[in-house]
Amino acid sequence: WCGGIRAETLANSALVDKLHICEIRPDRLEEVRTLTHPATATTDYKAIIANPDISVVYISTTPEQTHYPIARDCLKAGKHVLLEKPISMEFWEADELIQLSRDNNLKFTIGYSQRFNTKVAYAKKKIADGTLGKVVNVMVSRHLSRSLGKKIASRVRLSPAAMESTHDLDFVFWMLEPAKPVRVYSQGAYGYMKELNGSYDTMWTTVT
């Protein structure tokens, strides 16, 4: 789903010299190959890592548990990494990935796309230049359709609310730099999604 979208975007980008793709399902691999016309296509990500012509790896995989080991292997092989959220399922895994990138002088970032939203970037600019004055409170609400919630729940362990609200948290923290959160409180409520994957339908989060 998302991986195919990312591959098409990369195939059409002037910043990408050659595209190499990996997909574990042969039928999906062939489908994406037809859409993107890559230099190479494989079902084993280790073939991507072993290719000396590849300098950057974009990781967009499910389940989420695969993010850490694939990103780790890429960083150890000297590849720059753009990783879709979540960075990992455990804090120590995230810490290790960040340290690996620093130790190997590699670029490593998570695909928080709201930073490239012109409205969000404009708001950050106006906060930085003082137009909006001192920001003391930010409130964000996000609403998903039931159909999108079902689609997300079918492929990830995390709740749809958690998967989407992470974008909101990121752009708020980004806009308010260099301020950092010191306390987080969150609460959820079950509903329709509970029977699908045991996740919350609604979440409230307060960050101070």
Over which residues does each language-model region extend?
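Glycine-rich, N-terminal phosphate-binding loop of Rossmann-like dinucleotide-binding domains
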Residues: 60-62, 142
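Conserved SAM-binding strand-loop segment of SAM-dependent methyltransferases
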Residues: 38-45
